Amino acid sequence: MEAVSPIRRFTVDGVNVYYEHYQNPGRQTLVCVHGFLSSAFSFRKVIPLLRDKYDIIALDLPPFGQSEKSRTFIYTYQNLAKLVIGILEHLQVKQAVLVGHSMGGQISLSAALQKPELFSKVVLLCSSGYLKRSHPTIIFGTHIPYFHLYIKRWLSKEGVMKNLLNVVHDKSLIDEEMIDGYGRPFQDEQIFKAMTRFIRHREGDLEPEQLKKMNKPALLIWGEEDRIVPMEIGKRLHADLPNSVLYSLGQTGHLVPEERPELISEHIADFIK
């Protein structure tokens, strides 16, 4: 019997969203939400470890990955959270557990605050936190024609390898599959124009007062060597989220789904029980 492809697409609020659905009827649904400059690809090591136990959905947040690089969508965290909710409503999911990495953690928290009845628990993997909105000068700059070329130049200068070296602790983990998986979406020229809008529209992270209203059970997992979102941010989020627990992983950087998939999968399974 031929295996059913998990690849799906659905249009929510006028933007076409790519997602993967590893169906396991009757089981708890997990929704994997990736971080900035990433995609569902970042969960590729975690999903095989959990797919026998759970119904898993992993999406590409626009404009990243294989989702549409819309030039009309308003790229706020609130709107991206609505896309997550829209996919779940389309699939008639009654209740889910959010698993958000980095920026995806903020979007997961926004989704849980927007529609609390849809989500039972939240898992935050090195979640971003307490970031302010972009400086007004940068926001103004996004209105300048060809600003997208500055973004392209910046990303080209940094390069996929340099970015990966910055987000993992053990450099030996970086291989050709990883470089290709994280770099391929940026071969589409349209992403740079969409990212201009993303920079323009992105609001700041949730304020402490908003976080304190989040009474869902929350599991926080952090890499002790995270140079992107340091451990101190995890401790602050743990203090502000009233029903949270924090685990730290030694010898681990920011890209925890790639670096510690087995350990993360075990923590998630224990948390959901």
Curated annotation (Swiss-Prot):
The active site is at S102, H254. Its EC number is 3.1.-.-. Belongs to the DmpD/TodF/XylF esterase family. Residues 29-131 form the AB hydrolase-1 domain. The keyword Transmembrane helix does not apply. Gene3D superfamilies: alpha/beta hydrolase. It comes from Bacillus subtilis (strain 168). The keyword Transport does not apply. This is Uncharacterized hydrolase YugF. Keywords: Hydrolase, Serine esterase. One of its GO terms (molecular function) is carboxylic ester hydrolase activity. The lineage of its organism: Bacteria, Bacillati, Bacillota, Bacilli, Bacillales. It is an enzyme of class 3 (hydrolase).
